[in-house]
C-alpha cells in the first residue's frame, strides 16, 4: 500500500473530515482546528452552579445553557469575549479513548479554564497559553470520548448557536451605575458591544465589566430600557423597551433575538 493511501486510511479511521469547513451565519466559514479536552465529573459539582464562573452566568439551567458546556483556555477566552459562543467538538487521533466514528457535540463557552504555570503544557497545564483547550462538562465529554480518558486530542470549530426564545437581560447595579448580564444569545452567541437607552436619554455605550456583564455609569431607574446588542461577527439587534419603567434590580427580561 502506498504511503498516500495509508495516510488517507488513517484519516478515515480517526474520523477526520476531508471537507474542512462549516457554514456560519452572515456568510462566514470556520475550519477545523486542533486542540485538547478534559472534563469535570458531575459528582464533583461545578463552580458555575454555585453562582460562579468567569462569564457570570451562574446557574446554567436557569440561563438555558443546559448540560453541554465548557470552560475554555485563555487563547480562546479573550477576556470574556468568547462567553456564549458555540463550538462543535470531536475527539480524533486516539483509537483507545475516542468514540467510534468521531461523533460531535456542540458546547457553549461558559467559563474560563485557568492556566497552571507550575505544570508543563502536556501534563496538567492544559490551559496554559497558547494551548486551545476545552474543560468540558461530563455530559458533553461523554458524547465524544470515553469516561476513563484524562485528556484527549480534539478538533473544534465555531458554529452558530441555536437558542430557544429571546435574548435575556438581567439587570443589576446601583444608584449611580447600571449593569446587565446578557444571556441566551443565538447565532454568534458572543456579544461584542452593548448600548442602553432610557426614555430620557440617548444611546449610552456600555463597557464589558467581566464575562457577559456590561456596565455604564448612569442612573436609569424609573425609565423603560432598550438595548442595542452587537454580536461577535458585527450583526446588531435592537431590543426596544425590554424593561418597563418600574423595573427593579435583579429582574430578568426577555427581548428580541438574533435570527439567521
Curated annotation (Swiss-Prot):
Tissue expression remark: Expressed in panicles and flowers.
SUPFAM superfamilies assigned to the protein according to its UniProt record, in alphabetical order: Barwin-like endoglucanases, PHL pollen allergen
One of the Pfam families matching this protein, by short name: Expansin_C
Domain Expansin-like EG45: 52-166
Signal peptide positions (record): 1-19
Domain Expansin-like CBD stretches: 176-255
Cellular component annotations (GO), alphabetically ordered: extracellular region; membrane
InterPro entries found in the cross-reference section: Expan_Lol_pI, Expansin, Expansin/allergen_DPBB_dom, Expansin_CBD, Expansin_CBD_sf, RlpA-like_DPBB, RlpA-like_sf
Any single biological process term in GO: plant-type cell wall loosening
Membrane topology field: Peripheral membrane protein
Induction of the gene: By gibberellin (GA3) and wounding.
Free-text function comment from the UniProt entry: May cause loosening and extension of plant cell walls by disrupting non-covalent bonding between cellulose microfibrils and matrix glucans. No enzymatic activity has been found. May be required for rapid internodal elongation in deepwater rice during submergence.
Protein name listed in UniProt: Expansin-A16
Organism: Oryza sativa subsp. japonica (Rice)
